[in-house]
Amino acid sequence: LGDVPGTSGAIFVARPESNHPDRFGLFGAPPLEEGYVVLVGDRGLKRFPPPSEFLLSVWNRSRAARLVCCSIVLCCLCLTVFLYLSENMGQAVTTPLSLTLDHWKDVERTAHNLSVEVRKRRWVTFCSAEWPTFNVGWPRDGTFNPDIITQVKIKVFSPGPHGHPDQVPYIVTWEAIAVDPPPWVRPFVHPKPPLSLPPSAPSLPPEPPLSTPPQSSLYPALTSPLNTKPRPQVLPDSGGPLIDLLTEDPPPYRDPGPPSPDGNGDSGEVAPTEGAPDPSPMVSRLRGRKEPPVADSTTSQAFPLRLGGNGQYQYWPFSSSDLYNWKNNNPSFSEDPAKLTALIESVLLTHQPTWDDCQQLLGTLLTGEEKQRVLLEARKAVRGEDGRPTQLPNDINDAFPLERPDWDYNTQRGRNHLVHYRQLLLAGLQNAGRSPTNLAKVKGITQGPNESPSAFLERLKEAYRRYTPYDPEDPGQETNVAMSFIWQSAPDIGRKLERLEDLKSKTLGDLVREAEKIFNKRETPEEREERIRRETEEKEERRRAEDVQREKERDRRRHREMSKLLATVVSGQRQDRQGGERRRPQLDHDQCAYCKEKGHWARDCPKKPRGPRGPRPQASLLTLDD
């Protein structure tokens, strides 16, 4: 076409065959059909719109184009939301604590069946803050492991000041959920281990529970704080040979024989040679540890003195691991004398130690100064035949000797001496643990903001034991302890306890129960904020009403004063008029009122000026506006 004259630079333009306005192609574009091509020269050249204008024209002229574009945008948006939710849901972790909070109605129903009451805020506090500090392996997000729950329950039910009575309903409810799990707990409960056959050989004691939570996908990874104090290591009971402290033979000792291939401990012993001295009680003890216990023996082998199968008492001294654990897992005597005294008391009652064992126990758990103080107080507690403390040196040395006595624990007399010695030693520990009387220390013990009344009472009793010579458990001191409990409780609890009816007849237990009810009914921080806001609004409304009433009273008083002033002015003017008329002299019947001469009246008085009469002046009255 370029050879045709006059057609250089010509282009093809598509025009529809018909000029009908409703005929369009896809998305509103004009259709290109055969037979519709027109050759146009330079003069008739028509400029086409750019692609952007073409797209806008398609959007404005076609409903199908708008529908397709909206569908594409909506699909992209849905796909983005789906990918975002799938990624976030994959990172969510379900924990026992969150599981119980999601099903809190079932938790409350379980607690109601156990006749206890639980609250969600304290449930979260105990699970995430209190129970992890017991060092029994409880994670901050909770667990359904029955072993760990049992360990926490033992801590909660501990007698004395170390127990937590306020946490009893919560751990009991948690244990009930783990033992009899609802349907929403069963997938997370640890399966019970299969029953195994009884071992043929005596097994080692179980390892203590670890302080770290079990490795499971149910528990998130917990990071330990940077400044955590390392726990003292608990040594297991050593099964190796011990040194015979009772024998007088110096080391070296004979080496034990090589162990047998079958692992039987009896073959590892070395038979005594002929002419060798009789084995000491320690050697008998070492042999007895490798032998199975006697069938008819019901006492623990951990006791220093235990009754053997032949009716003779056998001596089992303390192991080094026991002494190490007692020393490193308990506070010092100066720091907490009550706790260490309770430990030594339990050891004295259960292990039945001899005089040497008592000295070893005191030397391990007490310092030199503390030991001397305990021994001095114990010797002061020795009583004579009349039941009073004695000062006779012979009686004191017989009952509580400072040097090793010749008490034979195989005889009844020797065992009686040991029992009396342990009682005196326990009395010395209790007396030495008391600080000088300081009632200010007792008065300084106050209830914390979130401390339960039971825990506060235990701290108060401990202060009485430590800083006063009185025993808080004595019925004669119950009134003093009760008054201190009321006055030193939290302000809200103390005010309500003081308003109790017949307060004098209430026992200390009744006061603690009432305080527990008040403590459990305390308002939450949200309720407290709502109450403060409501009281503030009521106070503002009351203040505004008082201001309005005061303004009305002020206006009424001002109006009353102005009325009194107006009445006073008017009455004064009236009195002036009446008084002026009375002061005029009385005239005779023929006397002039104007010139006071007789013979004519005032209207005929020649001295009175004649002329038009002016207007009579009007009396002016004061109004409130003036």
UniProtKB/Swiss-Prot annotation:
Tell me what topology the record assigns in the membrane. Answer: Single-pass membrane protein
Name the principal localization, coarsely classed: host cell
Checking PROSITE patterns in the record gives: ZF_CCHC
Q: Where in the cell is it found?
A: Host cell membrane
Q: Which SUPFAM superfamilies match?
A: Retroviral matrix proteins, Retrovirus capsid protein, N-terminal core domain, Retrovirus zinc finger-like domains
Which ranges of this chain reside in the Cytoplasmic compartment per its record?
A: 1-66
* Record key words, sorted: Coiled coil, Glycoprotein, Host cell membrane, Host membrane, Membrane, Metal-binding, Transmembrane, Transmembrane helix, Zinc, Zinc-finger
Q: Which Pfam families match?
A: Gag_MA, Gag_p12, Gag_p30, zf-CCHC
Q: Where is the sequence biased in composition, kind Pro residues? A: 198-212, 249-261
From the UniProt record, list the coiled-coil ranges: 526-566
Q: Where are the zinc fingers (CCHC-type)?
A: 590-607
Membrane-crossing residues? 67-86
Q: How is it modified after translation?
A: Glycosylated by host.
> GO: which molecular function terms?
nucleic acid binding; zinc ion binding
Q: Where is the composition biased (Basic and acidic residues)?
A: 522-554, 574-607
Stretches for region Disordered: 198-306, 522-626
Question: Can you cite a GO biological process for this protein?
Answer: virion assembly
| InterPro entries, A to Z | G_retro_matrix, G_retro_matrix_sf, Gag_p12, Gag_P30, Retrov_capsid_N, Retroviral_Gag-Pol_poly, Retrovr_matrix, Znf_CCHC
Q: Which GO terms describe its cellular component?
A: host cell plasma membrane; membrane
Residues carrying covalently attached carbohydrate according to the record: N113
According to its UniProt entry, what is the function of this protein?
Answer: Plays a role in viral particle release. Presumably acts by facilitating the fission of the virion bud at the cell surface. May prevent the antiviral activity of murine APOBEC3.
Note the PANTHER family from the entry: GAG_P30 DOMAIN-CONTAINING PROTEIN
Protein name, UniProt field: Glyco-Gag protein
